[in-house]
Amino acid sequence: MGQFTVVSLGLLAMFLSLSGAKGDNCPASWISRNGVCNKLFPDRKTWLEAEMYCRALKPGCHLASLHRDSDSTVLAWYISDHFKGAGHVWIGLRDTNRKRTWKWSDRTSTNYFSWNQGEPNNVQDDENCVHLWAPSGYLKWNDEPCASLHPFICQYKL
């Protein structure tokens, strides 16, 4: 009887600890990284159309924000492995005030940048949105006119 009680209490404790834990489960077509879910959408949209599409998917969903090299690497592998020839891919960074002050659409901090060499260059004073640059293997960023059409990555926190 004593062993049964110990096992039962152990299972109860495990159940209670797991029931309060946040799972790291993204829907089947999304990838998980560092507590967020990401998905690439191959439809070509403007930056604003892409951001609005992400927001309509789920509360708290936005174009992807990247905050460290490991975030960039995981998404680069994902895009390269599953979407060959996708072209450049929108992320959630843009210069809303046209003053070279870059902000994420999810309002998280902008303490990490992975610009391609010579970027951001704001060609013709019209490059205020950011995409993952395909020739860099999606590891580097480029500023681009927001009206350009690209696939995009949506992201939400678990």
Swiss-Prot record:
Keyword Mitochondrion among record annotations: no
Disulphide bond pairs: 26-37, 54-154, 129-146
Main location: secreted
Sequence positions that bind Ca(2+): 127, 142-143
Residues that span the membrane, as ranges: none
Identification of the protein by name: C-type lectin lectoxin-Enh4
Similarity section: Belongs to the true venom lectin family.
Extent of motif Mannose-binding: 119-121
Secretion signal span: 1-23
Any Gene Ontology CC annotation: extracellular region
One example GO MF annotation: metal ion binding
PROSITE patterns the record matches: C_TYPE_LECTIN_1, C_TYPE_LECTIN_2
Any single Pfam family the record assigns to this protein: Lectin_C
SUPFAM superfamilies named in the record: C-type lectin-like (SSF56436)
Locations listed in the record: Secreted
Entry keywords, A to Z: Calcium, Disulfide bond, Hemagglutinin, Lectin, Metal-binding, Secreted, Signal, Toxin
Species of provenance: Pseudoferania polylepis (Macleay's water snake)
Domain C-type lectin stretches: 33-155
Tissue note: Expressed by the venom gland.
Role, per record: Mannose-binding lectin which recognizes specific carbohydrate structures and agglutinates a variety of animal cells by binding to cell-surface glycoproteins and glycolipids. May be a calcium-dependent lectin.
